[in-house]
């Protein structure tokens, strides 16, 4: 869980920017999007192999 404390004399925009950066570094949004819906193990394997094939292509 990302936590950001607003510093003294810091604007809300700056604090929000720091919070967004910490959330993206932690991978919180990507993880929640990945776990939003149940995905069968067979579908996971298929997506994983397709991603590997795509990486190998380039």
From Swiss-Prot:
<dbReference type="Pfam" id="PF01165">
    <property type="entry name" value="Ribosomal_S21"/>
</dbReference>
<keyword id="KW-0687">Ribonucleoprotein</keyword>
<dbReference type="GO" id="GO:0005840">
    <property type="term" value="C:ribosome"/>
</dbReference>
<dbReference type="InterPro" id="IPR001911">
    <property type="entry name" value="Ribosomal_bS21"/>
</dbReference>
<keyword id="KW-0689">Ribosomal protein</keyword>
<feature type="region of interest" description="Disordered">
    <location>
        <begin position="37"/>
        <end position="58"/>
    </location>
</feature>
<dbReference type="GO" id="GO:0006412">
    <property type="term" value="P:translation"/>
</dbReference>
<dbReference type="GO" id="GO:0003735">
    <property type="term" value="F:structural constituent of ribosome"/>
</dbReference>
<dbReference type="InterPro" id="IPR018278">
    <property type="entry name" value="Ribosomal_bS21_CS"/>
</dbReference>
<dbReference type="InterPro" id="IPR038380">
    <property type="entry name" value="Ribosomal_bS21_sf"/>
</dbReference>
<protein>
    <recommendedName>
        <fullName>Small ribosomal subunit protein bS21</fullName>
    </recommendedName>
</protein>
<dbReference type="GO" id="GO:1990904">
    <property type="term" value="C:ribonucleoprotein complex"/>
</dbReference>
<comment type="similarity">
    <text>Belongs to the bacterial ribosomal protein bS21 family.</text>
</comment>
<feature type="compositionally biased region" description="Basic residues">
    <location>
        <begin position="43"/>
        <end position="58"/>
    </location>
</feature>
């Amino acid at each position: 869980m990302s936590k950001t404390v607003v510093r003294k004399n810091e604007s809300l925009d700056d604090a929000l920017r720091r919070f967004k950066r910490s959330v993206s570094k932690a991978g919180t949004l990507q993880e929640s999007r990945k776990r939003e819906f149940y995905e069968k193990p067979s579908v996971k394997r298929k997506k994983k192999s397709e991603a590997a094939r795509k990486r190998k292509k380039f």
